[in-house]
């Protein structure tokens, strides 16, 4: 029987498969599902739109673009998600408004050791370009890149994840803000909104919500 443990409830286990928000005894490819169910209610997977989700546990970053489904009901972290045959395939983890992520083997992913480095998340505003740790209109960013190109590169100290309606990017910068690395994912996505999926705790439970994030536009 497949077992799933929510990172937000302290369920990270380095001996199990790890995906954003969960550790599990199985590695489910969640890209293959078009319909899922929660407590016998069926929900369609959203087409061509994804949610960038991540956990930060034991100085490890586990992030990925995940499928999501629309649901107007209130779902708890840890609620089971099943396929159409009744097999459990995941649990509730992250939410953005009325959309819930389906965690497992997703699309583009990022697994990092955070020893000595930071990672930051940003909403990429429509029409903006990115250089390193800043976003702005294209002409401003072009000038910024020219300015920074004169500097010698140093060790990476921070990663920046940029989530936009049409494209997602990951950049890495040194101490001067010089861009050292960039990845582009040609998919539109959203970031989870923290604390909208509430956790009911017993009096002897401890709360571990290290997987929640604060996503705000940055300039």
UniProtKB/Swiss-Prot annotation:
Q: Outcome of altering residue 138 to A?
A: Stalls the 2',3'-cGAMP cleavage reaction at an intermediary stage
GO BP terms: symbiont-mediated suppression of host innate immune response
Q: List the disulfide bonds.
A: none
Where are the active-site residues found?
17 (proton donor), 138 (shared with catalytic histidine of dimeric partner), 142 (proton acceptor)
Which Pfam family, any one of them, does this sequence belong to?
Baculo_p26
What InterPro entries does the record tag this protein with? Answer: Poxin_vir
Enzyme class, spelled out:
hydrolase
Say which domain of life the source belongs to: Viruses
Query: Where are the residues marked Substrate binding as a site?
Result: 60, 105, 149, 169, 182, 184, 186
What inducers act on this gene? Expressed in the early phase of the viral replicative cycle.
Q: Which GO terms describe its molecular function?
A: 2',3'-cyclic GMP-AMP binding; nuclease activity
Q: What is its EC number?
A: 3.1.-.-
**Changing residue 17 to A: what effect?**
Complete loss of 2',3'-cGAMP cleavage
Kindly state which reaction or reactions the protein catalyses: 2',3'-cGAMP + H2O = Gp(2'-5')Ap(3') + H(+)
Q: Does the keyword Nuclease apply?
A: yes
Q: Please tell me one Gene Ontology term that the record gives under cellular component.
A: host cell cytoplasm
Instruction: Please describe what happens when the gene is knocked out.
Output: Knockout induces a 40 fold decreased replication of the virus.
Instruction: Note the subunit structure.
Output: Homodimer.
Biological function: Nuclease that is responsible for viral evasion of host cGAS-STING innate immunity. Cleaves 2',3'-cGAMP which is produced by host cGAS following recognition of cytosolic DNA and blocks the subsequent 2',3'-cGAMP-mediated activation of TMEM173/STING, which normally spreads to adjacent cells and activates the interferon and NF-kappa-B immune responses.
What note about domains is in the entry? The substrate binding site is formed by the N-terminus of a monomer and the C-terminus of the opposite monomer.
Its protein name is Poxin
């Amino acid at each position: 029987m497949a077992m799933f443990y929510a990172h937000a409830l302290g369920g990270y286990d380095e001996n199990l498969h790890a995906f954003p928000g969960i550790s599990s005894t199985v590695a489910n490819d969640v890209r293959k599902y078009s319909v899922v169910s929660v407590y016998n209610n069926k929900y369609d997977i959203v087409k061509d739109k994804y949610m960038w989700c991540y956990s930060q546990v034991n100085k490890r970053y586990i992030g990925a673009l995940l499928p999501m489904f629309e649901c107007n009901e209130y779902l708890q972290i840890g609620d089971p998600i099943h396929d159409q045959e009744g097999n459990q395939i995941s649990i509730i983890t992250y939410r953005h408004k009325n959309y819930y992520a389906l965690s497992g083997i997703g699309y583009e992913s990022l697994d990092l050791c955070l020893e000595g480095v930071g990672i930051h998340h940003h909403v990429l505003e429509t029409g903006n370009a990115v250089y390193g740790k800043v976003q702005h209109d294209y002409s401003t960013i072009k000038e910024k890149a020219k300015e920074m190109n004169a500097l010698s590169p140093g060790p990476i100290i921070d990663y920046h994840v940029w989530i936009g309606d049409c494209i997602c990017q990951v950049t890495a910068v040194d101490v001067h803000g010089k861009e050292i690395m960039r990845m582009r994912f040609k998919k539109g996505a959203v970031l989870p909104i923290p604390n909208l999926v509430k956790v009911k705790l017993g009096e002897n439970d401890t709360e571990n919500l290290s997987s929640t994030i604060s996503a705000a536009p940055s300039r």
